[in-house]
Amino acid sequence: MIKEETWSVSIQRARAFFREQEDVTEESINCFVYRTCRIALTELKPKGMGIWAAKRIQVRMEGEVADVEHIYHRYFIQFLSTGG
């Protein structure tokens, strides 16, 4: 399964989230692994201009369905509950 989405979250916050997960391994600065799921973070150009420019990242998760859904759910709840 592949899940690929754009989020209005800074790449630093996304990295910090994955680094805090005890069952996630960091392969490189923007690549993580959870069980069979590979997670790639890509920083995108901000959307908007000036002080209204929102930081954006692309989050790509690829692996077995259960693993992708499990780590995605944890990520989604973290950033949804904090407003991004």
Residue ranges and their predicted role:
Residues 33-53:
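A short, structured beta-strand/loop element
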Residues 6-24:
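Amphipathic alpha-helical segments
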Residues 4-10, 61-65:
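Short beta-strand-to-loop capping motifs
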Residues 18, 25-27, 43-47:
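Residue-level detector of functional hotspots within protein domains
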Residues 21-39:
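Surface-exposed, low-hydrophobicity interaction/linker segments
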Residues 13, 38-41, 64-71:
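Short, surface-exposed beta-strand/loop "edge" segments at domain boundaries and coil↔beta transitions
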Residues 54-84:
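C-terminal structural segments of small proteins and small subunits
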